[in-house]
Amino acid sequence: MENFLLEKIINKKLSSDQYSDVVPNGLQIEGEKIIKKIITGVTACQELLDKALSYGANAIIVHHGYFWKNESQCIHNMTRKRLTTILSNNINLYSWHIPLDIHPKLGNNAQIAKKLNIRIKGYILPYLFWGTLEENINAFDFSKKIEKKYEKKPIHIYANAPIYISRIAWCSGRGQNFIKQAYNFGIDAFLTGEISEETMHIAKELGIHFFSIGHHATEKDGIKSLGKWLNNKYDLDVTFIDIHNPA
């Protein structure tokens, strides 16, 4: 498949033109015209680039790419090394950020719901999903379920919160600042990737369960599901590489 055709296909699937983003979505760096082997990952870090080379890939698709707004435009140090690796090896670098967070089937938030058996009911905000569990569940049992599904223990703030959870809101990645909007919507628990210093106090004083799983952990499954879709629909050679990141 040609590189710009792949971009067009994914842009259409993720409805990329509908979203304003803080980073370019699509083919960020043009490489070899014909795509032979694709590596997917969360972030286009140097380790992922090196792994892609070892796999003989000439295309990389990530959730966190390059050229973010308000980022320095100077090409120094690690930025220089990363770009040199990509350009000197004729690699295509693709990135989809917000479109891959909120796609109703492939997106990170949809995948969280799938993993934790949450019925998606709608959106509180464009990036803030809400839904219900199959049945009311003890909050500590739900915490254990998260640990089992994500293979890591979540941070769980529960002071003053109800014992059982029915209505839950969630946002992949850096969503901790949505906790008040989630509370105002009348949910029992809020789940996201990151936690800030003030989040504990807000959750405690509002009497709401707060779960932090990690930015990386909540944003692996979207890029994985996109890769599986490309493999199944277009028979492309796609491999997901998980670069360990506890944050």
UniProtKB/Swiss-Prot annotation:
This is GTP cyclohydrolase 1 type 2 homolog. GO terms for molecular function: metal ion binding. One of its GO terms (cellular component) is cytoplasm. Keywords: Metal-binding. A divalent metal cation 1 binds at H63, D101, E219. Coiled coil: none annotated. A divalent metal cation 2 binds at H64, H215, E219. Belongs to the GTP cyclohydrolase I type 2/NIF3 family. InterPro entries: DUF34/NIF3, DUF34/NIF3_sf. Gene3D superfamilies: NIF3 (NGG1p interacting factor 3)-like (3.40.1390.30). It holds the Pfam family DUF34_NIF3. Homohexamer. It comes from Buchnera aphidicola subsp. Schizaphis graminum (strain Sg). PANTHER family: GTP CYCLOHYDROLASE 1 TYPE 2 HOMOLOG, NGG1 INTERACTING FACTOR 3. Disulfide bonds: none annotated.
